[in-house]
């Protein structure tokens, strides 16, 4: 029997952490972060980690598990998340995956092989190389490769191209989990307003000092490439004013949110909820209850 898990995804600033905590309290659960940046110690504000009070109220996993000088990949996430979910389940609790790194979460849910002859990073690099292509361009690649896909969709096209490229199906046919995937969304203007406001709050909380610490110590590491830090480096180098760097960060975050939504919409089977609608949290909790009772 597959392990039932709750997955909460969505763009940045939409309220994933708050919902995950509420779900954990309601259904005796623990939260597993599905965020590629929250793994780094010392990067708290720019990665929007759950506050110490929130982490004290509900146990969070895969936060602060790497130093800023260490790398972290989808391979690492899948390996560690699997062990974490198994531990949570063994204690009779519900695992709630919450985050915005679509590649990591999709890799976990679809049961990608972590062994085999083809290096996992090579597989992920190939998948990432297909992301910029439009549906029409993917269809053309499929045709060029001599492949046939009944009822074309983006996911089928990418899987077919992957199998043709590597000569084997690199996904497990049997996954470990039965997920309920909830994707939070908001009206675009409202979401962008939330993003801008959250960036302002981050600066008030000390983001500039946190980013300067990273800039002074390790400006070229993987951790420094995440949105929330690298946009401020031109300011530290004297190439931009603070106002310019702040606006650059807000713009980059808005663009990132758009890419996140595109990923979840095209690559994962999610149930969308508009956070601005009346009674949305009650409807989400009811759906989770029905899913767990089924």
UniProtKB/Swiss-Prot annotation:
Q: Where is this site: Interaction with substrate tRNA?
A: 101, 127
Q: What is its EC number?
A: 2.5.1.75
Query: Which cofactors, by name?
Result: Mg(2+)
Q: Which reaction does it catalyse?
A: adenosine(37) in tRNA + dimethylallyl diphosphate = N(6)-dimethylallyladenosine(37) in tRNA + diphosphate
Q: Which EC class does it fall in?
A: transferase
Please give the biological process terms from Gene Ontology that the record holds. tRNA modification
One family from Pfam that matches here is IPPT
Residue positions annotated to bind ATP are: 10-17
- Keyword ATP-binding part of the UniProt annotation: yes
Which keywords annotate this record? ATP-binding, Magnesium, Nucleotide-binding, Transferase, tRNA processing
InterPro entries attached to this UniProt entry:
Dimethylallyltransferase (IPR039657), IPT (IPR018022), P-loop_NTPase (IPR027417)
- Where is region (Interaction with substrate tRNA) located? 35-38
Family from the record: Belongs to the IPP transferase family.
What NCBIfam families does the database record attribute to this sequence? miaA
Q: What does this protein do?
A: Catalyzes the transfer of a dimethylallyl group onto the adenine at position 37 in tRNAs that read codons beginning with uridine, leading to the formation of N6-(dimethylallyl)adenosine (i(6)A).
What HAMAP family does its record include? IPP_trans
Instruction: Describe its partners and assembly state.
Output: Monomer.
This protein is called what? tRNA dimethylallyltransferase
Organism (species)? Streptococcus pneumoniae (strain Taiwan19F-14)
């Amino acid at each position: 029997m597959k392990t039932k898990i709750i997955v909460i995804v969505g763009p940045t600033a939409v309220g994933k952490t708050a919902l995950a905590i509420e779900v954990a309290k309601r259904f005796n659960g623990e939260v597993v972060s599905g965020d590629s940046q929250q793994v780094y110690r010392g990067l708290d504000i720019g990665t929007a980690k759950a506050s110490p009070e929130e982490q004290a109220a509900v146990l969070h996993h895969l936060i602060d598990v790497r130093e800023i000088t260490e790398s972290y990949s989808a391979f690492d996430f899948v390996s560690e998340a699997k062990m974490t979910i198994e531990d949570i389940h063994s204690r009779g609790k519900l695992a709630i995956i919450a985050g915005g790194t679509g590649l990591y979460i999709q890799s976990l849910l679809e049961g990608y092989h972590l062994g085999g002859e083809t290096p996992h990073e090579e597989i992920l690099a190939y998948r990432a190389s297909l992301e910029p292509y439009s549906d029409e361009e993917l269809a053309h690649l499929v045709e060029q490769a001599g492949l046939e896909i009944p009822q074309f969709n983006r996911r089928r096209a990418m899987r077919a191209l992957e199998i043709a490229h590597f000569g084997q199906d690199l996904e497990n046919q049997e996954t470990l989990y039965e997920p309920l995937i909830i994707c939070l969304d908001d009206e675009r203007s409202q979401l962008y307003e939330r993003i801008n406001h959250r960036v302002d709050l981050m600066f008030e909380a000390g983001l500039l000092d946190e980013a300067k610490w990273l800039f002074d110590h390790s400006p070229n590491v993987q951790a420094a490439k995440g949105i929330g830090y690298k946009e401020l480096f031109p300011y530290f180098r004297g190439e931009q004013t603070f106002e310019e760097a702040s606006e650059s960060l807000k713009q980059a975050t808005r663009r990132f949110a758009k890419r996140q939504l595109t990923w979840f919409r095209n690559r994962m089977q999610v149930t969308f909820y508009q956070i601005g609608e009346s009674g949305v949290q009650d409807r989400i909790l009811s759906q989770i209850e029905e899913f767990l009772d089924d």
